[in-house]
Amino acid sequence: MNSKLTALIFLGLVAIASCGWINEEKIQKKIDEKIGNNILGGMAKAVVHKLAKGEFQCVANIDTMGNCETHCQKTSGEKGFCHGTKCKCGKPLSY
């Protein structure tokens, strides 16, 4: 039960960080307080960093909020495609 609650809190913090309500640094400090600076804490901080740095909200090749498409239409007039957590204009996935 305790591990499920920890996972739920972690996912909530990741969602808050990706929305920009609180910054990544504050969340990483909370991870250090709760989990510690060990392998599990390092993995959690890496996930938070990877998800929080995506400015177009691309997650697992899915444009969750349409920001990638909007960005590409404004800048180049091409269709936007998510490649993992990155947005690429006019370059569809080849697999």
From Swiss-Prot:
<feature type="disulfide bond">
    <location>
        <begin position="58"/>
        <end position="82"/>
    </location>
</feature>
<keyword id="KW-0800">Toxin</keyword>
<dbReference type="GO" id="GO:0005576">
    <property type="term" value="C:extracellular region"/>
</dbReference>
<dbReference type="InterPro" id="IPR029237">
    <property type="entry name" value="Long_scorpion_toxin_alpha/beta"/>
</dbReference>
<keyword id="KW-0732">Signal</keyword>
<feature type="disulfide bond">
    <location>
        <begin position="68"/>
        <end position="87"/>
    </location>
</feature>
<dbReference type="GO" id="GO:0090729">
    <property type="term" value="F:toxin activity"/>
</dbReference>
<feature type="signal peptide">
    <location>
        <begin position="1"/>
        <end position="19"/>
    </location>
</feature>
<keyword id="KW-0044">Antibiotic</keyword>
<dbReference type="GO" id="GO:0042742">
    <property type="term" value="P:defense response to bacterium"/>
</dbReference>
<protein>
    <recommendedName>
        <fullName>Heteroscorpine-1</fullName>
    </recommendedName>
</protein>
<keyword id="KW-0929">Antimicrobial</keyword>
<keyword id="KW-0964">Secreted</keyword>
<comment type="similarity">
    <text>Belongs to the long chain scorpion toxin family. Class 3 subfamily.</text>
</comment>
<dbReference type="Pfam" id="PF14866">
    <property type="entry name" value="Scorpion_toxin_alpha-beta"/>
</dbReference>
<feature type="disulfide bond">
    <location>
        <begin position="72"/>
        <end position="89"/>
    </location>
</feature>
<comment type="function">
    <text>Has antibacterial activity against B.subtilis, K.pneumoniae and P.aeruginosa.</text>
</comment>
<keyword id="KW-1015">Disulfide bond</keyword>
<feature type="domain" description="BetaSPN-type CS-alpha/beta">
    <location>
        <begin position="55"/>
        <end position="95"/>
    </location>
</feature>
